[in-house]
Amino acid sequence: MAKISIIIPVYNVEKYLQQCIDSLLSQTLSDIEIICIDDASQDASGKILNDYAARDDRMKVIHADENMGTLRARIKGITDAAGQYVMFVDSDDYLEVSACEELLKLLTEHPVDVLHFGTVLHANENVSDDLKNWVTNFITP
């Protein structure tokens, strides 16, 4: 059983997907499973996921026949997860190389039901200042 099941809803994010998956496959904690739910993407996202899954058996890809939205995609991922812990990552996110290892250490030292960790927003040109401020205020205690 994997220590951490990482669930990623994927919908039309071919531009960001490789960086996301590469950051997960390069984690210092290798005892992970990565469950990607391709939510009926119309771009090359599904093919990108299949290519990664063919090269690394920690990757599992579920292809939805029709778009079900982020929440239902996450629920589908949870039902297929085998890890001791479940982690959600969005398909345009990427993690520092030791993130999973550090999170697992925190979870074993401080048994909690939910762990939320710091976020850094690297906004592209299409993100308004209002949204940047909302994200910053949301993640700041």
Residue ranges of model-derived segments:
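Nucleotide-sugar donor-binding/catalytic module of glycosyltransferases
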Residues: M1-P141
